[in-house]
Regions:
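Divalent-metal-activated hydrolytic enzyme cores
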Residues: 2-23, 27, 59-126
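Structural motif
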Residues: 34-37
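Surface-exposed, active-site-proximal loop segments in enzymatic domains
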Residues: 5, 46-57
């Protein structure tokens, strides 16, 4: 991408973030990871929403998009899911745990009320 990752004091962390993302992809591919569950709203791991600016400020701002590591995982062929994709995670649990039934009321993050009100529309890469 074209974005930069800046630390709380304005230090450019982009190169380190890319280095970490590359390491994450190599490790995931070596371990034959098929699905990564990552923390959304993160400059590294956001799958739908990322911080706009430093995450340590009193009032955070957000934008639609994917984090550095998420973008690299997607490019490496690894599916990424947000920890807030409750419906998808519950459906996966149904497959892994006989007898578990996902609630029909669960929603994935793109359907969350806050997400819909503050950042309408889906990010094309998510």
């Amino acid at each position: 991408g074209r974005g930069k990752v800046l630390g709380e004091h304005g230090v450019d962390l982009t190169a380190k973030m890319i280095e970490g993302g590359r390491a994450m992809v190599l490790h995931a591919q070596a371990a034959r990871v098929e699905l990564a569950i990552l923390t959304d709203m993160s400059a590294a791991c956001g799958s739908q929403v990322i911080s706009l600016g430093c995450r340590l400020v009193p009032v955070r701002k957000f934008q639609k998009g994917v984090g550095v590591a998420t973008a690299m995982l997607l490019e490496g062929g690894i599916v990424v899911c947000s920890q807030r994709d409750y419906f998808t995670l519950a459906k996966l649990r149904e497959r892994a745990e006989p007898g578990y039934v996902a609630s029909a009321e669960m929603r994935d993050y793109q359907e969350d009320e806050w997400r819909v009100e503050n950042l309408p529309g889906a990010h094309p890469r998510a």
